[in-house]
Amino acid sequence: MPKPRLTIIIFFLLIFSACTSQNSPAIELSPTPVSTLRAQPTGDSVKVGVLAIRSAAAANAQYGGIIAYIEEQIGQPVTLVPLTQEDQFSLMESGGIDFTFNNPLAGIQVQRTFNTEILVTLARNNTGPTFSGLIIVNKNSGITSIEDLKGKNGTCVNQQTAAAGCIFQVHHLQQKGVDPFTDFNSFTETPSQDNIVLGVLNGSFDVGFIRTGQLERMLRENTILTLDDFLILDQAEDDFFFPHSTALYPEWPFAAHPDTDPELVNQVRKTLLEMPEDHPALTEINSTGFVEPLDYSAMHELIESLQLKSWDAQ
């Protein structure tokens, strides 16, 4: 009597197993929405270091579309590597990145140190391939001129490698007879330009150094409520789209590590130069695309005259 019962049990187990194995592939092949599909390129990952002037998350949100476009065009995986002011040098030295995209001052400092090749220059809506720096104070601070900055508390992004977040303004003020390093009561570093603006607004700092377009972007994002809370010192009288204090300088360069494969370098250069002006990834960074490299000799002059990082590089 036990044998027939065992036979029946085994029979049903075999049927259940067969049904289960037949149903499994159907689960794996369930449809995926078209919007989430993405081609998977082959080959080693290409690493693009992007200077994160706000945060790593913001860098990924802003420039992720550019990276995805490069990946699509060259047929290889491309990884965005957010860079601090410090590791844009250390990762270049270690070979941890194949390309860099950073501010022009740091870009030229990296070039002087590691012999990178500048491929293109970023161009932005309304301003093209140039930008500038602002010297901002709280409108209610009582500060109305550069001379009033003596004895005050100032801040900038980085005193060695930040372009429109520091060095453009330092040079401008020194040319006007005010040295932030000796004439300010304090001159500190604040890595985030958002925090510089907010610090000036709430009185933590008397004066802050930021790039053109920073105030307008924060206004669009409702991080600040009005531009009327700020005064721009020594505002230039020209037809540049944004108000600014300093001279105009070339925008961010996109450069290649000297050991990056030449064929890949040419592919990336061509990809960026031919990127459609209306591509959503460019809209995300307020850009119209990339142009042939501008003349960065002004960066060399700043580096050497102020003896900044790489000033003595051979």
Residue map of PLM features:
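Short beta-strand->loop
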Residues: E117-T127, D183-S186, R220-A247
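An extracytoplasmic/periplasmic, membrane-proximal ligand-sensing/linker region
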Residues: L29, P33, Q40-G49, R54-G65, ...
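Bacterial signal peptide processing site
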Residues: T20-N23
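Acidic, polar ligand-binding/catalytic clefts
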Residues: S90-D148
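Extracytoplasmic small-molecule ligand-binding "clamshell" domains
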Residues: V34-I108
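A ligand-binding cleft/hinge motif common to bilobed small-molecule-binding domains
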Residues: P104-F114, H172-Q175, L201, D206-D234
